[in-house]
């Protein structure tokens, strides 16, 4: 008779349930969800976006085989004081962002949380708004930055 690892029979329900409960801990996504690891270690604390203050502008070198200096900014988040690096997408987008500006950042990547963008090592966030203006609209010339 071929052996089955799962108990089979009329009264095997409890054993099956306990085994399923034990085996779930080998599932990466289950562990992350139950222990709330995203909220614990994510600088955005599980939120889709966050506000922050620009500390400095930085240029990061792209990984091989590309050769470029990607324009990024260091941002201190208002909600928890953590400092993250955010990418500035678009041609000359860095020129619309000054130090001490308030920006809104969001994660780069998909549903599994922020992932590093393309050839920029360690940058998991991008700037989407500067002050009350969309960075994309500023780059396209449809809006002008409000001077205070």
Curated annotation (Swiss-Prot):
Q: Which InterPro entries match?
A: NA-bd_OB-fold (IPR012340), Ribosomal_uS12 (IPR006032), Ribosomal_uS12_arc (IPR022863), Ribosomal_uS12_euk/arc (IPR005680)
Keyword annotations of the record: Ribonucleoprotein, Ribosomal protein, RNA-binding, rRNA-binding
User: Could you name the domain of life of the organism this protein comes from?
Assistant: Archaea
GO MF annotations in UniProt: rRNA binding; structural constituent of ribosome
Give the UniProt record's GO annotations in the biological process aspect. Answer: translation
A Pfam short name: Ribosom_S12_S23
Specify whether rRNA-binding is a keyword of the entry: yes
- Matching PROSITE patterns: RIBOSOMAL_S12
Q: Which GO terms describe its cellular component?
A: cytosolic small ribosomal subunit; ribosome
Self-association and partners: Part of the 30S ribosomal subunit.
Q: Which family does it belong to?
A: Belongs to the universal ribosomal protein uS12 family.
Q: Give the protein's biological function.
A: With S4 and S5 plays an important role in translational accuracy. Located at the interface of the 30S and 50S subunits.
Q: What is this protein called?
A: Small ribosomal subunit protein uS12
Q: Which organism is it from?
A: Methanocaldococcus jannaschii (strain ATCC 43067 / DSM 2661 / JAL-1 / JCM 10045 / NBRC 100440) (Methanococcus jannaschii)
Ranked from the top, the taxonomy reads: Archaea, Methanobacteriati, Methanobacteriota, Methanomada group, Methanococci
């Amino acid at each position: 008779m071929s052996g089955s690892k799962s108990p089979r029979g009329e009264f095997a329900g409890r054993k099956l349930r306990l085994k399923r409960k034990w085996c779930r801990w080998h599932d990466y996504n289950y562990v992350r969800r139950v222990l709330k690891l995203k909220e614990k270690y994510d600088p955005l604390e599980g939120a889709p976006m966050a506000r922050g203050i620009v500390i400095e502008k930085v240029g990061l070198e792209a990984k091989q085989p590309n050769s470029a200096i990607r324009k990024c900014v260091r941002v201190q988040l208002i909600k928890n004081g953590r400092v993250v690096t955010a990418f500035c997408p678009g041609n000359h987008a860095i020129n619309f962002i000054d130090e001490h500006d308030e920006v809104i950042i969001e994660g780069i990547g998909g549903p599994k949380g922020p992932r590093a963008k393309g050839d920029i090592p360690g940058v998991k966030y991008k700037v989407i708004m500067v002050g009350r203006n969309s960075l994309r609209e500023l780059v396209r010339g449809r809006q002008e930055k409000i001077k205070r």
